[in-house]
Structure formats: structure tokens, C-alpha cells
Design a protein with these regions (language model features):
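Hydrophobic, aromatic-enriched alpha-helical segments typical of multi-pass transmembrane helices
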Residues: 2-243
């Protein structure tokens, strides 16, 4: 009984630092989504030619600055994701400190993997740069190596997404338990996060499945993060009604 009263007291009180952290999280959700989409859709996707390593390498070499801008934007996005992990931890720590910490750690692991993974971009740039010490390789070999490292980067993203999905699942469970946001939104977050983690794991085991599903399995997560970001900015966290 004492424990129940204690949990009720925690869940029905929102500290100023939680409100600030919720606002920060809302901004980061929306900004990170916008920057990551810009980096992929504008700065990188136009350079990639599926099934044609030679043309892809030529495009990257001809648009080196644009490719670098996309890579740097990705790095800044991953840095903001670390801020998001801390902000969510601050908001949801009163609900369950240990689970909030676990979720934050998983999100930080995601940030770390994706940040290190960006080294592949700069290896690709070296391979297509025409540097003297690479003349021991012929052009086709360099183009194939560039495509290889770019493919490795794609696998690195998938590994990071597993931890993103796991961390987001736990945070969503805490959102549901706290009732700081609508339960429907929190429930959708659990669903979207599990889909991201599970489907990504399946793709890592069965790579050809990735060609079949494309990026559609990420759509639920997109709508969840945009919806949550807007809610936190417009409504903030609310005191749950205890019945």
C-alpha cells in the first residue's frame, strides 16, 4: 500500500525540469527528423545509382561537397539524438528510474554506432578522390570498394536501428505507464518501436527481405516521433488524472 501511494505521488507530480526536458525533446524530435531526411533525400539519395557502382562513385566524386554536407548533417543529427536520450530520461525517470536509464543507454548506443559508422562515408570519399597512393588499384576496383564501404554503412545503420527500436520501446512503455501523453500515442509508440527493432533484426538475418519491404517498416516510427514531438511542443507533459 505504501509503495502504491509513493508511485501515485510520483506519477501525479511533474517537476519544472521535466517540463523543460519535454520541450527540449519535442524540438529535438522534429529537428532531427527534418535534418536526417534532408541528408538522405537531398544530399545522398540523388547520388546513388542502384546496381551501378561505377556511376555511384562518379556521382560522389563529382558532388563531393554535397556528400560531405550530408555526412556532417548526419553527425549533427546523431549528436542531437544523444541530447534527446538524456531529455527523455529526465522526463521519465520518476516513473521508473532503472527502465528510463536502460532506454537512455540503448538510445546512446544507437548514437554511438551511427556516429562511428559515418567513417565509411569518409573512406568512400578517399576511394573516389583520385589520390596518388590509390593508383595501385584500377578504376573499377576503386569503384567497387567505394560501393562496398557504402553498403557496410547501410548495415551499420541497421544495427543502430535495433538499439533505437529497443530504447524507444522502453521509453514508450514508460510514457504509457506515466500517462503524461495520450495512451493511444504511447501505445502506437510501442508498436512502431517494436516493428523497427524486430523487422531490422529479421533483415540482418535475411538481407533479401530488405529489398522487398524497403523503408515502409520505418513509417510507423516516423509518424510516432513526429506526433510525439508535436505533442511535447504544443501540449507538453500533463499531470495524469488519478481515478
Amino acid at each position: 500500500m505504501t509503495k502504491q501511494r509513493h508511485e501515485s505521488a510520483i506519477s501525479s507530480t511533474i517537476e519544472p525540469e521535466q517540463r523543460v526536458a519535454a520541450t527540449v525533446a519535442g524540438y529535438v524530435y522534429l529537428i532531427a527528423m527534418a535534418t536526417s531526411m534532408f541528408a538522405e533525400i537531398y544530399a545522398r539519395a540523388p547520388l546513388m545509382v542502384r546496381g551501378n557502382a561505377a556511376q555511384t562513385a562518379i556521382n560522389i566524386a563529382a558532388n563531393e561537397r554535397l556528400f560531405r554536407i550530408g555526412s556532417v548533417i548526419h553527425l549533427l543529427t546523431f549528436a542531437s539524438d544523444a541530447v534527446l536520450a538524456v531529455a527523455l530520461y529526465v522526463v521519465l525517470r520518476p516513473v521508473n528510474r532503472n527502465l528510463a536509464l536502460l532506454a537512455a543507454v540503448w538510445r546512446l548506443v544507437d548514437c554511438s554506432i551511427l556516429s562511428v559508422n559515418m567513417l565509411n562515408d569518409f573512406i568512400v570519399l578517399r576511394l573516389v578522390s583520385g589520390t596518388d597512393y590509390l593508383r595501385v588499384f584500377d578504376t573499377k576496383q576503386l569503384q567497387a570498394l567505394a560501393r562496398l564501404f557504402y553498403s557496410v554503412e547501410a548495415s551499420g545503420f541497421q544495427i543502430g536501428f535495433v538499439f533505437l527500436g529497443l530504447g524507444s520501446t522502453v521509453f514508450s512503455v514508460l510514457w504509457l505507464k506515466s500517462r503524461y501523453i495520450p495512451r493511444a500515442l504511447a501505445g502506437w509508440g510501442i508498436f512502431a518501436s517494436l516493428v523497427l527493432a524486430i523487422v531490422t533484426l529479421v533483415i540482418l538475418v535475411f538481407p533479401t527481405l530488405g529489398d522487398a519491404v524497403g523503408l515502409t517498416y520505418m513509417a510507423p516510427m516516423f509518424f510516432y516521433e513526429v506526433g510525439l514531438g508535436l505533442w511535447l511542443l504544443i501540449k507538453g507533459v500533463r499531470i495524469p488524472v488519478v481515478t
